A protein has these predicted regions:
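Residues within mature, well-folded domains
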Residues: 1-144
């Protein structure tokens, strides 16, 4: 799944905290950086005695999906919808509408535990921005 290693490290931004990112990026050699990256994912492997790391696979599958479905002005993983999808996975429900007199489109994504995200396309070109909640600052566990 990982084609560009440096990009794969940058894409950790939604699951790695600042200290973890600093630790990986402070490696002196590419081999050391690769080892630290692998250790990061080994700690999150739900079945460490198998060859497959389901957490790693799921995370980068979500990034691929985000790039294919939410890209536009930037890569899908960098968009607000991409970020929410990568962190929380597929929403239980997506409500789409145009309640505004100016024709702006909204999408409301609903997840379990009454968690909702509201996106509005202010430009009319599919560039949906997260408006509620305004900040997703926690490092969430994957919603599997």
């Amino acid at each position: 799944i990982v084609i560009d290693f440096d990009k794969a490290v940058r894409q950790l931004r939604y699951v790695a905290n600042g200290d973890e990112m600093d630790f990986i990026n402070s490696a002196k050699t590419i081999d050391e950086k690769t080892k630290r990256f692998e250790q990061f994912w080994e700690k999150r492997d739900p079945t460490p005695r198998t060859t497959r790391n389901e957490a790693f696979d799921e995370y980068y599958l979500r990034i691929t999906y985000a790039n294919q479905n939410f890209g536009g002005y930037s890569e899908g993983w960098l968009t607000d919808k991409g970020m929410v999808f990568i962190i929380f996975g597929k929403p239980m429900n997506i409500e789409r509408g145009t309640p505004y007199n100016d024709g702006r489109v909204y999408e409301r994504w609903t997840y379990s535990s009454n968690r909702e995200f509201l996106f509005i396309d202010n430009s009319g070109f599919g560039d949906f921005r997260l408006v509620s909640p305004r900040l997703v600052s926690e490092k969430y566990e994957y919603n599997k």
